Amino acid sequence: MALKKTEIYSTLWASCNELRGGMDASQYKDYVLTMLFMKYVSDKYKDDAFGDIVVPEGGSFDDMVALKGDKEIGEKVDKIIAKLAEANGLRGVIDVADFNDEEKLGTGKEHVDRLSKLIGIFEGLDLSGNRADGDDLLGDAYEYLMRHFATESGKSKGQFYTPSEVSRILAKIIGVDDNTPLDATVYDPACGSGSLLLKVSDEAPRGLTIYGQEMDFATTALAKMNMILHGATGADIYKGNTLSSPHFVEGNQLKTFDFIVANPPFSNKNWTSGLNPESDEFDRFTWGIPPEKNGDYAFLLHIIKSLKSTGVGAVILPHGVLFRGNAEAHIRQNLIKQGYIKGIIGLPANLFYGTGIPACVIVIDKNTAQSRAKGDAGLFMVDASRGYMKDGNKNRLRSQDIHKIVDVFNSQLNLTGYSRMVELDEIIDNDYNLNIPRYIDASIDEDQHDLTAHLKGGIPVADIDSLESYWQVLPNLRKTLFSELKHSGNGYCECLVASTEIKAAVLAHPEFITFAEQSLTPFNDWWQATQLSEITKGDRPKALIHKISEDLLQRYEIAPLLDKYDIYQILMDYWSESLQDDVYAISQDGWQVGAQLRKLVVAKGEKLKEEPDLIINKVKYKAELIPPALIIDRYYSDEQAHIDALQAELDTISSTIADYVEEHGDEEGLLADAANEKGSFNKSSVNARLKLATDSDEIEALKQLLAYFELEANAKKVLKEAQETLDLAVFKHYPTLDEAAIKTLLIEDKWHATLQGRIEDEIERITAQLANRIKELDERYAEPLSQIVDEVEMLGQKVQAHLQAMGVA
């Protein structure tokens, strides 16, 4: 059975985090990621004499498994890792974590149990098939773990990881495409764990030649392991200080590269350590020397010097580089004059693990620099600061945010409040200040109140006109909802529908019904074109989702009112939640995997990590792809209807009991003495009281309650038997499912129904926005000042009359 991506992720993280104890995540990651590496290379290469990695005798994960429970497990695990490291030139890479460190891993039995359980987590994973279909499950799992470790590590220790969403943006805006050759070079001077380099390399069909330098020893090891896990075994990753001792040089010059990406440490205060910028042997600071206590521009200047004359780079830096003065202003002015800066993308705040401050992407393009230097071309700016989702205590870019940024930047689209081309003259007029809000107004217009409408009543026509995008699609709906008032000045309308009925009126309007139907047409056409029934073993899920998601995006290009990126996000969310697991399973094991049920086995004393779908004779089962509800809906709807009726009957009886107890169970009620110690009523407590009762009314009440209890017990018994009968029928139905039935259940009943339902929800959300705005306007101006004054006067007269009647006025 194929491993589900989400199963790998959740199992690894939950289990590893459980074993972490009090250890800092920044330290524990070294143990977990080393173990993942050992498991992968052992599964992948132990029987491959010509593989990229040699697995020596006594140096495999299998040897670790044999150590579970061994009193010397820590020392022996270190020796196993050392053998693999020695055989592959990986000393100082995979042997960084000390598995015999009792201070971190505990002593005695605690140490043995912790390592034995850690090995046991990975023992259950078969990673031999990773990348066999061109999809990097393991690399993605590695990145998933790093994301979580970065989140847990806190502000000072999470800088080794650039969020994959940001990496994807950089990879897609520097010009790597299907025509980029394998010998094209990509370089990251502050490569961290290497995820940014790998994202760029993945954009080329055959990969790129990778170079990276990283100052931190443990992080360099992470990067080297990451390269191997992603199949980039030829990557050249070097440990060292890029600014003071750049490793990649040719003669007395810096080596130059086709592409450069980087997320260097923000505002490094020690960037001059080991370096005299005034006499830099590589002439990196020709355009100016950055401030001694702020190294942002030091990295940018190093990148520019390291680019070929046709090279393109993208670097993540804090927003301050766009507008800070003094030395940085001088450097910025020189870079603009040289035309090096092609564009700037402003990102949301709090995306990165090392800092919460907002950052930007500066894109350097030497190939087109001359036209910008002459003023023939401008500098393209994007303000993407408002497109994100909350993810715990961080912000995170969604798939739609990434796609929009990339689309807009690569096509240089001018979108109001989001992006525009800024000419050199305008930048000069702003004294070379590149602060994005100077050029793009992304603020939301304040909702203005109309004083005349508050005084005289009516909804301002200007407010109704502001909904013009709706009226273009629903012109007659406007006439249905509003009519013009004829008081002074005109320009005001009244709402013809009660405030509480506005949404219903919109939904029932013929134009809306037509709009809703037409909004589903692109989806229906797209669905027919996806040909998901043609998925076969060996297909590449990542290629599939790329193809169908791009097609869906294109089909909603001109759909009125709907945002094509919102529709795209619906598909990508469902892909992450469920669809990718289904497709991965089918691509590895075929459609028949849909008929499989997996028995859930849990060790004694442990809890189930998954909720069972079926329980048959006390044995718990998990459906791999098709939940029982889908089989029930298609094949056992009558039986389910019967169960629903039985449940309703039981609910009625239970409600009757609750009402009866509420009526007679208070302190002076007939059932007052029938409650148990906890104050509740059950068959035992009522029978006990019945033996002592002498009052005929009390006896009758007790017997009535017992009769209700009997009815409830019988109803529960009948319901339980019916449910067990249905569960057994469904259980027996799974093995009878043929490929055609599985495809129908998955494609139509699960995938199509879910996606269509969510798009219908999006259509309704758009409608709700219109209805809510109209309701807001109607209620805002419902009581003009004159009406309020009249009401106050009327109430005053009533009070005066009452006072007179009382003789006090």
For each feature predicted by the language model, list its residue ranges.
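Conserved S-adenosyl-L-methionine
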Residues: 156-262, 267-288, 297-298, 317-320, ...
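Non-catalytic, mostly N-terminal accessory regions of nucleic-acid modification and defense proteins
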Residues: 1-178, 238-247, 346-349, 373-383, ...
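Short, well-ordered loop/turn and helix-capping segments at boundaries between secondary-structure elements
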Residues: 37, 229, 266, 309, ...
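Conserved Class I SAM-dependent methyltransferase catalytic core
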Residues: 11-14, 18, 27-37, 237, ...
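Glycine-rich phosphate-binding loops of NTPases
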Residues: 387-415
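Active-site lining segments that contact anionic ligands and/or coordinate catalytic metals
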Residues: 256-257, 294-296, 310-316, 338-342, ...
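Hydrophobic alpha-helical scaffolding
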Residues: 108, 131, 212-216, 259, ...
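Extended, highly charged linker/hinge segments and catalytic-adjacent loops that couple domains
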Residues: 259, 270, 276-278, 378, ...
